[in-house]
Curated annotation (Swiss-Prot):
GO biological process: 1,6-anhydro-N-acetyl-beta-muramic acid catabolic process; amino sugar metabolic process; peptidoglycan turnover
Binding site for ATP: G15, T16, S17, L18, D19, G20, V21, D22
Any Pfam family: AnmK
GO molecular function, one term: kinase activity
Family: Belongs to the anhydro-N-acetylmuramic acid kinase family.
Pathway membership: Amino-sugar metabolism; 1,6-anhydro-N-acetylmuramate degradation; Cell wall biogenesis; peptidoglycan recycling
Principal EC category: transferase
Lineage, top ranks: Bacteria, Pseudomonadati, Pseudomonadota, Gammaproteobacteria, Thiotrichales
E.C. designation(s): 2.7.1.170
UniProt source species: Hydrogenovibrio crunogenus (strain DSM 25203 / XCL-2) (Thiomicrospira crunogena)
Keyword set, alphabetical order: ATP-binding, Carbohydrate metabolism, Kinase, Nucleotide-binding, Transferase
Gene3D superfamilies recorded: 3.30.420.40
Name of protein: Anhydro-N-acetylmuramic acid kinase
Length: 366
């Protein structure tokens, strides 16, 4: 009699902030998820620099792209092995890895989405079955391929009707858990523009706790100009990324407002994230009863306090309901792997605009 499959999965995620690899060890049994361990393994400075360049360069050298594909796969493999070592597990304990990869280009209008960090290398390097390439099946069914997070938010928080979940990574997205259907879409910039501005002008990778933004003043003229971006007025379903909201998008505004102090600009970028989230919340079919925040933006106290100041309902991080804000997307990847191995379609029609729900991802064996 064969042994039952392991209930343990590893989820690997690197978002548009390009911080490194988020790795989650997740138990999934009888439809219930339990986070066993979570760690972030930072990219090397050199790899991060190369990925930033690749992410903002639509015309790339194929050799450089293949080199990055290989390097990111190795980074994901090393993160897996370190997580296993730190948790006293071995490869045979794990049923599968769910690897999102590193998004380099996402273009629903083509439609195509490119994530690098080839899963064949991850599977062979770790000795663990690897599930990846989650977005393209949805796009093949006329969906936007993003955001995927709302489907997982439904899984985690689906019994809390009237909850809105906002994931603030490099880009922000909203999930609204409603009795009729789950809605979700990208609102616009999250931490991405602020992080790039900090790297360029403050010699740091991000604004810790939003402290620098708090000391600045919002420049209302600049904010008004930023808010004219056509994406903000598009109806859902919609998705965006760093291919739009990057330094190339921001630089013309910086040139126009060159007399504005750096801290005031950072404060204004913080408010841009707040206002575009509020704008997205205002398009929902009914007012949420509460707002849960996850992603790196959950640590930006200035951003959170500004959101709460403009909303009449409670704003809390997902930690308040027992789920670490940083771990959710990596947990999602573990769940997507389990769903793929069970051939379970993911309900995305009301989120991405797909014509039918899809079984997401492909499988690579060790």
């Amino acid at each position: 009699m064969s042994n039952p499959p392991s209930k343990l999965y590893i989820g690997l995620m690197s978002g548009t902030s390009l911080d490194g690899v988020d790795a989650a060890l997740v138990s999934i049994q009888n439809g219930e998820l339990e986070l066993k361990a979570f760690q972030t393994f930072p990219y090397t400075d050199n790899l991060k620099k190369q990925l930033h360049h690749l992410n903002q360069t639509p015309h790339v050298d194929l050799k450089a792209l293949c080199d990055m594909e290989y390097q990111v796969a190795n980074a994901f493999s090393e993160a897996t092995q370190q997580l296993l070592d730190n948790c006293d597990h071995v490869a045979s304990d794990i049923r599968a890895i769910g690897s999102h990869g590193q998004t380099i280009f996402h273009a629903p209008d083509i439609p195509m989405s490119l994530q690098i960090g080839h899963p064949a290398f991850i599977a062979k390097n770790t000795g663990i079955t690897t599930v990846a390439d989650f977005r393209i099946d949805d796009m093949a069914n006329n969906g936007q391929g993003a955001p995927l997070a709302p489907a997982f938010h439904q899984k985690l928080f689906g019994n809390t009707v009237g909850t809105a979940v906002v994931n603030i990574g490099g880009i922000s997205n909203i999930t609204f858990l409603d009795q009729q259907k789950t809605l979700g879409f990208d609102t616009g910039p999250g931490n991405g523009l602020m992080d790039e501005y900090c790297e360029q002008f403050f010699n740091c990778s991000y604004d810790a706790d939003g402290k620098m933004a708090q000391t600045g003043q919002v420049n209302m003229a600049l904010l008004s100009d930023l808010m004219q971006e056509p994406y903000f007025r598009l109806p859902a379903p919609k998705t965006t990324g760093k291919d739009l909201f990057n330094s190339d998008w921001l630089n013309p505004f910086l040139a126009k407002y060159s007399n504005v102090s750096k801290k005031d600009i950072l404060s204004t970028l913080n408010q841009l994230t707040v206002d575009t989230i509020i704008q997205g919340l205002n398009t929902l079919p009914s007012q949420p009863k509460r707002l849960l925040i996850c992603g790196g933006g959950a640590e930006n106290k200035t951003l959170i306090s500004r959101l709460q100041a403009q909303l009449s309902y409670p704003v809390k991080t997902t930690q308040s309901v027992g789920v670490p804000p940083h771990a959710i997307e990596a947990m999602m990847c573990a769940w997507l792997a389990e769903q793929r191995l069970n051939n379970t379609p993911i309900a995305l029609q009301h989120i991405t605009g797909a014509t039918k729900d899809s079984v997401l991802g492909a499988v690579w064996h060790p």
